[in-house]
From Swiss-Prot:
Record has Cell membrane as a keyword: no
Gene that this polypeptide is encoded by: ZDS
Entry's family note: Belongs to the zeta carotene desaturase family.
Lineage: Eukaryota, Viridiplantae, Streptophyta, Embryophyta, Tracheophyta
Protein purpose: Catalyzes the conversion of zeta-carotene to lycopene via the intermediary of neurosporene. It carries out two consecutive desaturations (introduction of double bonds) at positions C-7 and C-7'.
One Gene Ontology cellular component annotation held by this UniProt entry: chloroplast
Origin: domain of life: Eukaryota
Reactions accelerated catalytically: 9,9'-di-cis-zeta-carotene + 2 a quinone = 7,7',9,9'-tetra-cis-lycopene + 2 a quinol
Full protein name: Zeta-carotene desaturase, chloroplastic/chromoplastic
Amino acid sequence: MASAACCSSAYVAATSFGNFKGYRRVGASLDRKVSDMSVNAPKGLFPPEPDIYSGPKLRVAIIGSGLAGMSTAVELLDQGHQVDIYESRQFIGGKVASFVDKHGNHIEMGLHVFFGCYSNLFRLMKKVGADGNLLVKDHTHTFVNKGGDIGELDFRFPVGAPIHGIRAFLATNQLKPYDKARNALALALSPVVRAIVDPNGALQDIRNLDHVSFSDWFFSKGGTRTSIERVWDPVAYAPGFIDCDNISARCMLTIFALFATKTEASLLRMLKGSPDVYLSGPIKKYIIDRGGRFHLRWGCRQILYDKTDSGDAFVTGLAMSKATEKKIVKADVYVAACDVPGIKKLIPAQWREWDMFDNLFKLVGVPVITVQLRYNGWVSELQDIERSRQLRQAVGLDNLLYTPDADFSCFSDLALASPEDYYKEGQGSLIQAVLTPGDPYMPLPNDEIVKRVQKQVLDLFPSSQGLEILWSSVVKIGQSLYREAPGKDPFRPDQETPVKNFFLAGSYTKQDYIDSMEGATLSGRRAAAYICGAGEELLSLRKKLAADEAHDLSEASNSLSLV
C-alpha cells in the first residue's frame, strides 16, 4: 500500500467538471462550520453546550461501540463519569466500522459521506482531534447518467444561502426547463422558505409532514415525476436507502431546510482514508485517554432487572458472554447503543408492556449491500482514454457521485476521494457502490453481485470498457438504517426510558435529524444529557441497591449460621 507521501502527488490531478468561473472555494475549517450551525439553528438539531456537571460520578455500561455509543461515552467522560463500552464484534465502529482483510484491503460497512450540516459529528471530531481527517470536495452534487453524461447541482457561487441553492437548481443540467420550473414551485411552497427566517417553526412544520411520503408531498405542490426519478430518488437513496415514494417528507425537507439556510450545509466531505483509522480510531483514543474502557467480543445475552414495591423497573446487571466466558456486568447506568435489530433482541419481552418499547417493533431496517471494485485503470476519467489507462497519476471524479441509472444510487472512487488507505501505486480506481434497496440482491452469491454491478458501472462510464477488475468485496447488511417511511417517526423512542437506570442511544432514536452518522452522534449527546440530569436520582438508586444487596448477604449469612 502506498504511503501518504507516495500518493500525495498522484491524486491531486482529479478531473473537475463544470467549474464556475470565479467561485470561492470553501475552506475546511470545522470551527467555522460548527459556529455557523450554532447561530440561528434549531435547538433540536444543535443543542447548546452542556453545563459543567456537579452531581455524583456514575459508573456507566454502554452496549455498542458505534457512533452513538462512543458519542455518549465522550460526553459522559467529559463530565467525570466512569465508562465501559461492550462490543460483541472484534472491531469498533458499528455502521461506520471498517477492517483490514488478510491482503491489506480496507473493507467498509458502507459509503460514508459527511454533509456540511453534520455539525454534531464535526463537533465530536474536533473534540477528539480528528477534524483534520476530512477532505473537502468541490461544492457540487454530481449525477452520472447512462452513457457518461454528467449532470450537476452546482452550489459554487459568490453569494451564499439561499441564493447559491436557488442558482444551483435553476442552472442544473440534470432537469429540463419545465421540470426545473415545477421543482422550483414545489420548493417555494415548502416549509424550507420559513426556515430562512424561523428555523424552529419550520422544523415543527416539517415534523408535521412525517405522515406523507416525499413524492406525495412533492406532487401536491406541483413537482414532476421526472424530477423525482432524475434528481430526488438518487438523493433520497444516499442518506435514507429508500426512494421518494417510500421515504417520509420529513426526512427530505429536514435536509432541504438546512441546505436553504446554511451555505455550507450542502458541501460534502469524505475521510482521508478508512473510518477505523480516521474516525473511530481518534474517538477510541480520546475515550481511553480519559479512563474509558473497551471490551471487545463481549456480547450482551440478557438484561437483568427487578422492580420496586411500587412497580418501578430498574436494571440490576447485564449477562455478558465472550466465547465460553460468562460474567455479570454491574453499573449505576446502562445504555443500549444498538441498531434496530439489536435493540429488539435485547429488550426483555416483559418490557413491551410499555408502549415505548413495544413501538420499537414497528421499526424495521433496510437491507444494504456495499460493493468494492478495484480496477487496473481510472473508471471515471471521461475526457482522455489514454489518461484513464495509465497508472502513474490518479484521475477522475473526486466526489460523491449520484446516479438515477443504476441499482446503486450513490458511489465514489475512493482511490481519489479517500486516498490515504485506498490509493495503491500501480493500481487504479476503487469504486465503492451502495446497492439500495438491497432486497433483490441479498440472496445472490457475491460473484453474481459483482458481475451485475460491473455491468452497470460500464453503462455509466463507457470509456472504462476494457478495464479489468483486480479485486472485489461484497458486504451484506440485512438491516441497516431504519426504514424512515411515512408515519414512523412517532414510534422512535426517546433516549430516556421508563426503566430508571436504562437509556437508549442510536440514530433511530428520537432526534430531529434523520437516521445517519449525524443522528447517531446527536442521540449520544441527548442520552448523556438525560443521564447527567438524573444524576442524584441514579445515586439514590445505587445506594438502595447496595443496601438491598447487603441485606440479602446478611440474611444468607444468618441462614448459614443457623445451619
